[in-house]
Amino acid sequence: MARLTFHGHACFELATDTGSNLMFDPFLDDNPIADIGTADVGKLDYVLCSHGHFDHFPDGIKLARRTGATMIGAFELMAFAETQGVEKTHKMNVGGGHTFPFGYAKLTPALHSGTVAGDNAGAFTTLAHGFWLDLKPGPGSEGGKRVYHSGDTALLMEMQLLRGRVDVALLPIGDNFTMGPEDAARAIEFIAPRVVIPMHYNTWDPIAQDPNAFVRRVGPLAEVVVLNPGESYEF
């Protein structure tokens, strides 16, 4: 089985059926609700960063440098990571996909600002995006599993293109900087995932939300799994 572990904010660690360890949008060392720091992360094969903001990207650089993991993300973001000492990157752009040892990864549209933390000259500004993964099945698995990490985003009509193609959706509900609970529920209508795990909420007061109220709002549209930092979901 694959396992998703929530580390707070938009950071998830994904252990795949085939033995790869991935981490989405690391934000650990300065995250007030994270259960671990970057020094606590062990084996890591890939770091996936949806955009360059301080709460999604700089810890990814730390982890890639220490573990030797490959960073995956938008072209300009990965080019900046290389200037910071990251040796292995895979540059992509929105709408493009690539087959990795863990499966197929595609960058999906997101509507969010794209400045890069640490890029004081502003030379590496890029598009924010999400990730859609079609994971390779492991031994004894009935089939691959499809994971959608939306990144920070507003509600997008393009999400309808994912309908019926997502097993587990990781969606922000915090409002203020991203879509809130109402728009996230509409996103679920668009995507029709089997399971939804809310993210990007309760890190700071401006994005405080009651996840149980979100569960009630979503109702029968999908199974909502609320994870506290450090908790995991297997699928």
Predicted segment positions?
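Zn-dependent metallo-beta-lactamase
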Residues: 1-21, 27-32, 213-221, 226-232
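Beta-strand-turn-beta hairpins that frame and shape the catalytic cleft
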Residues: 1-3, 15-22, 97-106, 135-147, ...
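Pre-active-site segment of Zn-dependent metallo-hydrolases
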Residues: 13-53, 58-65, 113-125, 153-164
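Active-site neighborhood of phospho(di)ester-bond hydrolases with catalytic His/Asp-centered motifs
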Residues: 23-26, 44-52, 72-75, 147-151, ...
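Active-site environment of divalent metal-dependent phosphoester hydrolases
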Residues: 30-31, 53-58, 78-81, 96-99, ...
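Glycine/small-residue-rich loop that forms an oxyanion/phosphate-binding "nest" at active or ligand-binding sites
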Residues: 58-124
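Binuclear metal-ion centers of metallo-dependent hydrolases, dominated by the metallo-beta-lactamase
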Residues: 70, 82-97, 185, 189-235
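Active-site-proximal loop/helix segments of hydrolase catalytic cores
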Residues: 120-129, 134-189
